[in-house]
């Protein structure tokens, strides 16, 4: 099984968030943390949105951001920023007109544009609740999963959902079979 590749677009989003919120010094500190692993290029290389880079590098980039920028709260904020950064204004207008369930199901179909491993499934235990499962992900990192939770939270808010509550109830990085996020909203 391949360890996977991740799209350059997301690397650029991570860099943008660190630079905007924490500054150039934080980017340099992250590059310094990644250098012994051979991944400083996540910060220093010219990366194009359509480039494919190692998933392991992307996950280590997330871990270094967590260490330099302040833990779980920072990763939730990064996830929310990623959603805002990647979903353009005209998409947001359309999102308000469609059902959150339909949008969530169809957005999961876009996964392969960002990562070449893993597979999403969404289940609906009741109308204002969903459980998202990420299967067949050879590597993951708890900080990445927290950022994903921030992304999901903001995504649902952009769909018009209120009082969004999410729990990452199972994680491959914590020994689980899958990564599982459970959410409710009004």
Language model features with spans:
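Conserved catalytic core of nucleotide polymerization and phosphodiester-bond processing enzymes
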Residues: 161, 185-186
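N-terminal leader/assembly segments
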Residues: 1-69
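Amphipathic interaction/junction segments at domain boundaries or subunit interfaces
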Residues: 47-147, 162, 170
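Short, non-transmembrane amphipathic alpha-helical segments
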Residues: 146-160
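Beta-rich nucleic-acid/ligand-interaction surfaces
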Residues: 166-184
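Non-catalytic regulatory/interaction regions at protein termini and inter-domain linkers
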Residues: 4-9, 18, 126, 133-136, ...
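Short, well-structured alpha-helical interface segments that form or flank functional binding sites
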Residues: 25, 143, 147, 176
């Amino acid at each position: 099984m391949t360890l996977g590749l991740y799209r350059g677009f997301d690397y650029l989003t991570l860099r943008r968030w660190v630079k905007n919120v924490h500054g150039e010094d934080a980017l340099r500190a992250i590059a310094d943390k990644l250098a012994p692993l051979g991944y400083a290029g996540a910060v220093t290389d010219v990366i194009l949105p359509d480039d494919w880079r190692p998933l392991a590098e992307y996950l280590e980039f997330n871990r270094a951001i967590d260490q330099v920028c302040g833990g779980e709260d920072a990763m939730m904020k990064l996830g929310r920023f990623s959603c805002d950064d990647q979903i353009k204004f005209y998409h947001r207008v359309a999102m308000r007109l469609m059902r959150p369930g339909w949008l969530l199901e169809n957005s999961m179909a876009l996964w392969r544009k960002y990562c070449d491993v893993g597979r999403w499934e969404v289940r609906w235990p009741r109308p204002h609740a969903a459980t998202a499962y990420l299967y067949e992900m050879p590597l993951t990192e708890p900080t990445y999963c927290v950022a994903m939770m921030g992304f999901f939270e903001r995504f649902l808010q952009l769909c018009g959902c209120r009082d969004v509550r999410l729990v990452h109830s199972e994680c491959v990085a914590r020994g689980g079979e899958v990564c599982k996020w459970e959410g409710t909203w009004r």
